[in-house]
């Protein structure tokens, strides 16, 4: 069974200082059933039509997913991965979401799941303890709070959990190195493991956050 990975859908602006929002992650589709014509190919996977076209003006109107490629696609080119993806022409998640829309989408979408074993993953006890302490402090903050977590307990996922569960308007993260800045930027873009099918701590209906990365003075 052959597969092909469709590119993510995102909004991005800026060059050095970047603002980014992931609208939909990569999609892996089976390419066993492919309809071809002179301008485009339609992959049918689980009843959903994915159209890949080399011409932005010619594509399958019935397909909810339409992706522009650098050349006319064929099944063999998809199998060989001999095709370059350019941009989404049509996607169900192509929406304009304001920061308020994002925050509102997080309401009642966070689950306080405790990790029991490898088959039932969730947040570790130190993470849940820190998260509850943070949320309690945020209800009536009179002064700054400091949360200390042991090495290896998952500080990043705790920050991401606080962002969504607390429906924070803004979170500022400072880091000591360029490498860590890029690493955390990528984590915040995707919400780490929180939205993955394995964890499902954050529901799939919740929108991804709008994330900025500052690398130079304004």
Where do the model's predicted regions map?
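Conserved RecA-like ASCE P-loop NTPase motor core of nucleic-acid helicases/translocases
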Residues: 170-177
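ATP-dependent helicase/translocase motor core
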Residues: 2-148, 157-166, 186, 190, ...
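Conserved helix-turn-beta segment of the N-terminal RecA-like "Helicase ATP-binding" lobe
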Residues: 179-215
């Amino acid at each position: 069974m052959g597969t092909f990975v469709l590119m993510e859908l995102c909004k991005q602006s800026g060059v050095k200082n970047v603002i980014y929002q992931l609208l939909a992650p990569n999609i892996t589709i089976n390419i066993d059933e492919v309809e071809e014509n002179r301008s485009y190919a339609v992959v049918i996977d689980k009843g959903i039509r994915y159209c890949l076209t080399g011409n932005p003006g010619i594509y399958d109107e019935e397909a909810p997913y339409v992706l522009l490629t650098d050349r006319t696609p064929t099944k063999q080119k998809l199998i060989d991965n001999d095709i370059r993806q350019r941009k989404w022409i049509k996607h169900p998640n192509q929406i304009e979401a304001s920061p308020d829309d994002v925050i509102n989408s997080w309401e009642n979408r966070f689950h306080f799941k405790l990790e029991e074993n490898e088959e039932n993953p969730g947040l570790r006890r130190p993470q849940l303890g820190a998260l509850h302490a943070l949320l309690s402090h945020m209800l009536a903050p009179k002064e700054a709070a400091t949360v200390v977590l042991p090495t290896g307990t998952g500080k990043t996922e705790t920050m991401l959990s606080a962002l969504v569960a607390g429906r924070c308007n803004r979170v500022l993260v400072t880091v000591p190195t360029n490498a860590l800045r890029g690493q955390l930027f990528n984590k915040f873009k995707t919400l780490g493991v929180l939205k993955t099918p394995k964890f499902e701590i954050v529901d799939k209906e919740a929108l991804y956050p709008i994330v900025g990365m500052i690398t130079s003075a304004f």
